[in-house]
């Protein structure tokens, strides 16, 4: 695991018994489950070490450990096999949503362009029996747009008596879990209430897409491919949504590495296929991303929007200044020598700790902070950027960063599909349904006594 104090895998500040050090969830291969050799009999058992999770501070309960064991290839193949063997009335529609930060991993892994990697991944998943493959960028569009509106509102309402700032992003599940389980009430009010891209995608698939296909939400099995293991915990946090007939938005999360392992050990002949969209027979013709070094781009897009809405300033190029280290950057909007906006990016628990200490002391001068648990951002997720011994594969990470930077940037405001969905799905940009579907709340949760890990 990574220590919040030094970001190293092993740290003397955390002591464990031998049993706790080796706590893991076994993921049997499909061949074990079926007790027969099939086309995936080569897939080795995968182990998800709970101690590797960045959000490990007494937060993984025994019940959650059991649920995490279902966030696995075993659960995915179980549904695939049921679709092959059961009566059609019991079939599930399998939908896979791929995070944009996962695509550079597949491009680097298989020496392909991002577009070709996207098509190869889509073709492979459909050859397994998946019905639809989506890109989560459209969900990030909603998350960013709602974050932009929330920041402007907070800025206007902020005062010494009613402290609304800094607004801290909430798209990183490791950081959110740490805030809820460890930091609690002093910090939670600063968390942005806009849902993460994964949560929004769950609603898009199980609500909008389900109605378009005349399907009940529970008839869809939704898998997310993501760069980090914390996304599995995020799927559990989403809970059972009343708007989705009591179903979860995301049923299963598989990391990029888990999918790559399945691909490498499969004998299937794969044909490249364009990624689907939520809009009928229309296909994704090009891969796009938001403006961020390794993230979903909340900092850059909220900064530009705030500069325009609050001060009438149009910002083209954003200059990031590294301060304490390469994972803490500052962005400012200045006019006539006065700093109008001061934003920051804080990646890794070392910078998060420094941020929290200064925030509690009232010596944190920022209006907005993009917070990510992983040093160097989402591309460095432990589900795709680590070696077998648990260290970061620096060469692979550098290659992925180069690939990611080459993907065209599209601002969320430019998506006509998003504007259509606001009207068709959410009844307008300021409707009560927007608040219900695209926003969430946070709770201060005491560390659980039945956890599979221990406190620092």
Swiss-Prot record:
Q: Which GO terms describe its cellular component?
A: lamin filament; nuclear lumen
Location, primary (coarse class): nucleus
In alphabetical order, the GO MF annotations are: lamin binding
> Annotated region Disordered: where?
12-36
Keywords attached to this Swiss-Prot or TrEMBL record, sorted alphabetically, are:
Nucleus, Phosphoprotein
Q: Where in the cell is it found?
A: Nucleus
Phosphoserine found at: 29
InterPro entries (alphabetical): Cytosolic_Fe-S_CAF, Fe_hydrogenase, Fe_hydrogenase_lsu_C, Fe_hydrogenase_ssu
Q: Tell me, how does this one assemble?
A: Interacts with LMNA and binds to the farnesylated C-terminal domain.
Q: Which family does it belong to?
A: Belongs to the NARF family.
The identity of this protein, by name, is Nuclear prelamin A recognition factor
Protein source organism: Rattus norvegicus
The record lists the lineage as:
Eukaryota, Metazoa, Chordata, Craniata, Vertebrata
């Amino acid at each position: 695991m990574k220590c919040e104090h030094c970001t190293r895998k092993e740290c003397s500040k955390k002591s464990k018994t031998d049993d706790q050090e080796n706590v893991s969830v076994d993921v049997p291969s499909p061949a074990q489950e079926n007790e027969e050799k099939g086309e995936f009999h080569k897939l080795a058992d995968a182990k998800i070490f709970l101690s590797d999770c960045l959000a490990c501070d007494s937060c993984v309960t025994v019940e959650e450990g059991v649920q995490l064991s279902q966030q696995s290839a075993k659960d995915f193949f179980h549904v695939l096999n049921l679709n092959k063997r059961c009566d059609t009335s019991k079939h599930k529609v399998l939908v896979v949503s791929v995070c944009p930060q996962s695509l550079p991993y597949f491009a680097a892994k298989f020496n392909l362009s991002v577009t070709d990697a996207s098509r190869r991944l889509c073709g492979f998943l459909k050859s397994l029996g998946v019905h639809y493959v989506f890109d989560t960028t459209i969900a990030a569009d909603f998350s960013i747009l709602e974050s932009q509106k929330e920041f402007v509102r907070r800025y206007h309402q902020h005062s010494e008596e009613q402290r609304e700032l800094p607004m801290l992003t909430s798209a990183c599940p490791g950081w959110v879990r740490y805030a809820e389980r460890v930091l609690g009430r002093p910090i939670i009010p600063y968390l942005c209430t806009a849902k993460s891209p994964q949560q929004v995608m769950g609603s898009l698939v199980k609500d909008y897409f389900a109605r378009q296909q005349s399907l009940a939400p529970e008839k869809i099995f939704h898998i997310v491919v993501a760069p980090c293991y914390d996304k599995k915990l995020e799927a559990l946090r989403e809970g059972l949504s009343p708007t989705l007939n009591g179903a979860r938005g995301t049923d299963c999360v598989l990391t990029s590495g888990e999918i790559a392992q399945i691909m490498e050990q499969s004998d299937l002949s794969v044909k490249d296929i364009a990624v689907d969209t939520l809009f009928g027979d229309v296909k994704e013709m090009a891969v796009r991303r938001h403006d961020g070094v390794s993230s979903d781009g909340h900092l850059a897009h909220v900064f530009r929007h705030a500069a325009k809405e609050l001060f009438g300033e149009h910002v083209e190029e954003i200059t990031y200044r590294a301060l304490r280290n390469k994972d803490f950057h500052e962005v400012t909007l200045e006019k006539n020598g006065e700093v109008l906006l001061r934003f920051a990016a804080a990646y890794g628990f070392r910078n998060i700790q420094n941020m929290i200490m200064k925030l509690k002391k009232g010596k944190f001068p920022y209006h907005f902070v993009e917070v990510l648990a992983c040093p160097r951002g989402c591309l460095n997720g432990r589900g795709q950027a680590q070696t077998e011994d648990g260290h970061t594969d620096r060469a692979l990470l550098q290659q992925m960063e180069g690939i990611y930077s080459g993907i065209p940037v599209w601002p969320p405001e430019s998506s006509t599909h998003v504007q259509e969905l606001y009207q068709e799905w959410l009844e307008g940009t300021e409707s009560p349904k927007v608040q219900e579907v695209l926003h969430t709340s946070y709770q201060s949760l005491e560390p659980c006594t039945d956890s599979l890990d221990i406190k620092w």
